[in-house]
Each structure stands twice: as C-alpha cells, then as structure tokens.
Amino acid sequence: MPRKRKCDLRAVRVGLLLGGGGVYGSRFRFTFPGCRALSPWRVRVQRRRCEMSTMFADTLLIVFISVCTALLAEGITWVLVYRTDKYKRLKAEVEKQSKKLEKKKETITESAGRQQKKKIERQEEKLKNNNRDLSMVRMKSMFAIGFCFTALMGMFNSIFDGRVVAKLPFTPLSYIQGLSHRNLLGDDTTDCSFIFLYILCTMSIRQNIQKILGLAPSRAATKQAGGFLGPPPPSGKFS
C-alpha cells in the first residue's frame, strides 16, 4: 500500500461557509454534512461586506470621539476664558461697536464729509484693537487645548494605525494625501486614515457646538472683525 502523505498544516485554512463550515488543504477538501461551500465570488462579497461594516463602526466611533474632544475643548475654554470678567467685558464691547459701526456704514454716503470718514476710521481702529485683545485672552486656552488634542490624537492614532476607517468619495489633492493616506497600505488614495477623519470631524463639530451653546461670535462681529474672528473690514470705501 502506498504510504499516506501527511497534510501540509501550513496550507490548511478554515473557511466560513454559509450555513456551516469546512476545512480546505492543498491536497484535500472536506465540507461538513449539510453545508454548501461558498464560491470564491461569494467569499469576496462576504469579505467586502465585513470590511464595510467594520469601517462604518470605526467612522461612528471616530465621530463620537470628536464630539467628546470638542466638548472637552469647550469646557477647558469656559474654565479659562468664557467665565472671566475680562472676556465678558471685551466681548460686550466688540458686539456693541460692531453693530454701531455697521449701522453707520449703511447710512453714510460717498459725499460724506472728511470728519465723518475720520470718525468711522477711528471706530474701526478701536474695534480692531478690542478684537486683538479678545484674541489674546482666548490664546491661553489654545495652548491647553492643543496639548490635550495632541495627547489624545497620539493615543487614538496608535489604536487605528494602519487601518482604513472610511472611503473618501473623491481623490484628495496630492499635498493632502500625505495626511489622508497616512500609514495606510496600498495605492488606493480614496482610503481614509484616522488622523484625517478625526481632524475634519473635530473642526466641524466644534464650530457647531459653539453655535449651539451660544459661544460663537455674532454675525456683526464676524463681519466687522479682523484677525481670528473674520476678514478685515473693507475700509477702502472711506479713504
């Protein structure tokens, strides 16, 4: 009798089958009774569904993490900035000056006297100085928030390192791909890394949280302010 060949254990793989299971080797194939083996196409479909469900779960987890970090950032800012008397006073002055300046700009005409134009320019300069002071008050909270974000990002980045957490519906620009495809295998540029999705979610969610909590600057202040709060006022009209 010919000697039986030993099975190559390294070539043996256990496949999950629809309705049961089976064992496959390089020299044999065995399926359990009552089980129907999946075709290679069905196996690829099942694997793809599993990957998509995993990415969806990772995306929801990252959104939840972003919400928590945004709330933490606003909590730190409230403790260090929002509740202080100096911030409240500067914010009230900026709001008052912005509305007053906007109203004057709407009523002034091109034929206005030089004295009126000089008065508006002085108010613009005063508003710019108050905005700068307001930004400096908020600056001390930015260092604490930056430290917390860096620590949390490093911790979660080690958990999601090398994992595709989402599929982008577009191909990112070449200078963004270093961030969107960071530490990912393969050449598919639509694969999204943790750090890219985390930054996008945190930036957008925090702005919405500020609006919901009433901590964002008003439209008038944003329109008239320069620096951190918005574009500089178009003063060329009055020169």
From Swiss-Prot:
It is found in: Endoplasmic reticulum membrane; Golgi apparatus membrane; Mitochondrion membrane. Residues 1-55, 158-171, 182-191 are lumenal. It catalyses: Ca(2+)(in) = Ca(2+)(out). SMART domains: DUF106. It is a multi-pass membrane protein. Keywords: Calcium, Calcium channel, Calcium transport, Coiled coil, Disease variant, Endoplasmic reticulum, Glaucoma, Golgi apparatus, Intellectual disability, Ion channel, Ion transport, Membrane, Mitochondrion, Phosphoprotein, Transmembrane, Transmembrane helix, Transport. GO terms for cellular component: cytoplasm; endoplasmic reticulum; endoplasmic reticulum membrane; Golgi membrane; mitochondrial membrane; multi-pass translocon complex. The modification Phosphoserine is found at S111, S239. It comes from the Eukaryota. The keyword Endoplasmic reticulum applies. The keyword Coiled coil applies. Residues 172-181 dip into the membrane without crossing it. Changing D191A: Abolishes the calcium channel activity. Changing D191E: Retains some of the calcium channel activity. GO terms for biological process: calcium ion transmembrane transport; endoplasmic reticulum calcium ion homeostasis; ER overload response; multi-pass transmembrane protein insertion into ER membrane; ossification. Residues 84-137, 214-239 are cytoplasmic. GO terms for molecular function: calcium channel activity; ribosome binding. Signal peptide: none annotated. Its main location: endoplasmic reticulum. Widely expressed in adult and fetal tissues, with higher levels in thymus, prostate, testis and small intestine and lower levels in brain, placenta, lung and kidney. Present in most tissues in the eye, including the trabecular meshwork and retina (at protein level). The chain crosses the membrane at residues 56-83, 138-157, 192-213. Homodimer and homotetramer. Homodimer under resting conditions; forms homotetramers following ER calcium overload. Component of the GET- and EMC-like (GEL) complex, composed of RAB5IF/OPTI and TMCO1. The GEL complex is part of the multi-pass translocon (MPT) complex, composed of three subcomplexes, the GEL complex (composed of RAB5IF/OPTI and TMCO1), the BOS complex (composed of NCLN/Nicalin, NOMO and TMEM147) and the PAT complex (composed of WDR83OS/Asterix and CCDC47). The MPT complex associates with the SEC61 complex. Belongs to the TMCO1 family. It is linked to Craniofacial dysmorphism, skeletal anomalies and impaired intellectual development syndrome 1: An autosomal recessive disorder characterized by craniofacial and skeletal anomalies, associated with intellectual disability. Typical craniofacial dysmorphism include brachycephaly, highly arched bushy eyebrows, synophrys, long eyelashes, low-set ears, microdontism of primary teeth, and generalized gingival hyperplasia, whereas Sprengel deformity of scapula, fusion of spine, rib abnormities, pectus excavatum, and pes planus represent skeletal anomalies. Endoplasmic reticulum (ER) calcium-selective channel preventing intracellular Ca2(+) stores from overfilling and maintaining calcium homeostasis in the ER. In response to endoplasmic reticulum (ER) Ca2(+) overloading, assembles into a homotetramer, forming a functional calcium-selective channel facilitating Ca2(+) release. Mediates ER Ca2(+) homeostasis in osteoblasts and plays a key role in bone formation, via the CaMKII-HDAC4-RUNX2 signaling axis. Component of the multi-pass translocon (MPT) complex that mediates insertion of multi-pass membrane proteins into the lipid bilayer of membranes. This is Calcium load-activated calcium channel. It comes from Homo sapiens (Human). The lineage of its organism: Eukaryota, Metazoa, Chordata, Craniata, Vertebrata. The gene is TMCO1.
